[in-house]
Each structure stands twice: as C-alpha cells, then as structure tokens.
Amino acid sequence: MLDTQQIKEIIPHRYPFLLVDRITEVEEGKRAAGYKNVTANEDFFNGHFPEYPVMPGVLIVEALAQVGAVAMLIKEENRGRLAFFAGIDNCRFKKQVKPGDKLELEVDITRARGTIGRGKGVAKVDGELVCEAELTFALGE
C-alpha cells in the first residue's frame, strides 16, 4: 500500500490536483488500484454545484489517470518521467459521486509500447460502477 507521501514520490501531482489518497494494489506496468475519500471540503464543490455538490466527471477520469500513472511510473526505468494524458475513449458515467463517498479506482494497463500506452479504468462507490473509460497516455521527460 502507498500513502499520499509515497504517491507524491512517483507522480508530480499536488494539492489541489492530487486526486488519489492511497494506492492499495500495484503491479508494476500492469495494474494499480486505489481510492480517494471525497469530502465536502473539496475546492471543486464551491462551483459544482453549491446547492447540489457532485464531483465533476472529468476529475473522476483524472483520478483514474493518476492511478494508471502510478502503475507505469513506479517501474524503475520510468522513475522521474511524466505520464501525460493523451486520450479518452468509451467513457461512460453511471452514477454521481458526492461528498462522503469513497471513490474506488482501478486501472489495468492493456497496452504499453515505447512511450505510448493504454489502460482500462473503472471507478466505483460502494462496489457500484460510477465511471469506466479507456485511457491513453504518453510517457515524457
């Protein structure tokens, strides 16, 4: 298991854009799982929406991308590199994510060749699917 400090040693994201609290499982270059505890104090709830707070879907996808980045950047040969978001396909949102939810995040790397890779991301709350997407990333310096 990786805590927030250990995650920050692998990916460059910082508050308020670090969207993963813990990595619970990781297989270098193959898959990673983790979670974000969504609190009422998240900055994005100030405007999305003040009377009905819902986590923006793009931030759910970004959280998935960060988990996928951990799977790739934890590999010794990728340490110190960046994982850039290069595309999203077949993204679907099934349920809303609200304050108090524990957003469970899983990414399976389906393809990695050179500096380009793809992963299948799934986000759940209480075991129920809230988002799924195919993510494309590019590794850079």
UniProtKB/Swiss-Prot annotation:
The active site is at residue 48. One of its GO terms (molecular function) is (3R)-hydroxyacyl-[acyl-carrier-protein] dehydratase activity. It is found in: Cytoplasm. Its EC number is 4.2.1.59. It is an enzyme of class 4 (lyase). Pfam families: FabA. Involved in unsaturated fatty acids biosynthesis. Catalyzes the dehydration of short chain beta-hydroxyacyl-ACPs and long chain saturated and unsaturated beta-hydroxyacyl-ACPs. GO terms for biological process: fatty acid biosynthetic process; lipid A biosynthetic process. It comes from Bacillus velezensis (strain DSM 23117 / BGSC 10A6 / LMG 26770 / FZB42) (Bacillus amyloliquefaciens subsp. plantarum). GO terms for cellular component: cytoplasm; membrane. Keywords: Cytoplasm, Lipid A biosynthesis, Lipid biosynthesis, Lipid metabolism, Lyase. This is 3-hydroxyacyl-[acyl-carrier-protein] dehydratase FabZ. InterPro entries: FabA_FabZ (IPR013114), FabZ (IPR010084), HotDog_dom_sf (IPR029069). Belongs to the thioester dehydratase family. FabZ subfamily. It catalyses: a (3R)-hydroxyacyl-[ACP] = a (2E)-enoyl-[ACP] + H2O.
